[in-house]
């Protein structure tokens, strides 16, 4: 950040009074700019025993497979954002279920949230950010072509939980959570 969004004057990085972290501060108007992580919201769209994945048409990781997800928009909830991204990227209408995974990606200044989702029909089509969209059984997922560690981790947790009967037991389950390190590779 170089300029203040309030008055357009240049900003400087310093620790403001009564704070403990370096921030972008405008010396002209006194505005302190807090740079916060961005939320990436998505879903695990399920139809029967299959999961819907999208092959990315954009960078980063062009040509790799991912769950439908993207940046949360101002004015929407995380679950509404997950449903919107699923429709935009995969052309699928879903009923959003509970939050399933929360993955912290501090080196990318992001938090990834994935919701369980049930497709309302078998209809789907690639959106502008997807080369193709397909339903996969667990054994057919192209595991070596998954775009991001957060997606791979979420899918691994999902299939392990499904195999253990967590989803069919009717019992409450906790949100899966962990931090993704910058050194993690697919």
Spans of features found by a protein language model:
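Acidic, metal-coordinating catalytic segment for phosphate/diphosphate chemistry
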Residues: 1-42
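Short, flexible loop/turn segments with low-complexity composition
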Residues: 165-176
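Nucleotide phosphate-binding site architecture
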Residues: 5, 12, 27, 52, ...
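Conserved hydrophobic "DFG−1" position in protein kinase catalytic cores
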Residues: 45-46, 53, 117, 135
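Unchanged
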Residues: 72-157, 161, 165-167, 181-186
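Short connector loops at helix/strand junctions that flank enzyme active sites
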Residues: 21, 38-40, 46-48, 60-62, ...
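Conserved Nudix-box catalytic region and its N-terminal flanking loop in Nudix hydrolases
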Residues: 46-88
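Active-site donor-binding loop signature of nucleotide-sugar glycosyltransferases
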Residues: 28, 56, 69, 117, ...
């Amino acid at each position: 950040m170089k300029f203040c969004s309030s008055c357009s004057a240049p900003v400087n990085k310093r620790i403001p009074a009564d704070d403990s972290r370096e921030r972008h501060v405008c010396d002209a108007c006194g505005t302190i700019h807090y740079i916060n992580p961005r939320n990436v919201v998505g879903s695990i769209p399920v139809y029967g025993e299959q999961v819907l994945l999208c092959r990315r048409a954009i960078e980063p990781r062009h040509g790799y497979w991912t769950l439908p997800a993207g940046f949360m928009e101002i004015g929407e909830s995380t679950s509404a954002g997950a449903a919107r991204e699923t429709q935009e990227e995969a052309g699928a209408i879903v009923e959003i279920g509970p939050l399933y995974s929360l993955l912290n990606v501090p080196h990318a200044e992001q938090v990834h949230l994935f919701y369980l989702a049930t497709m309302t029909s078998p209809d789907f089509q690639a959106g502008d950010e997807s080369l193709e969209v397909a339903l996969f059984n667990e054994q057919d997922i192209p595991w070596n072509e998954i775009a991001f560690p957060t997606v791979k981790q979420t899918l691994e947790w999902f299939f392990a939980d499904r195999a253990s009967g967590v989803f069919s037991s009717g019992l409450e389950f906790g949100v899966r959570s962990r931090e993704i390190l910058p050194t993690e590779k697919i």
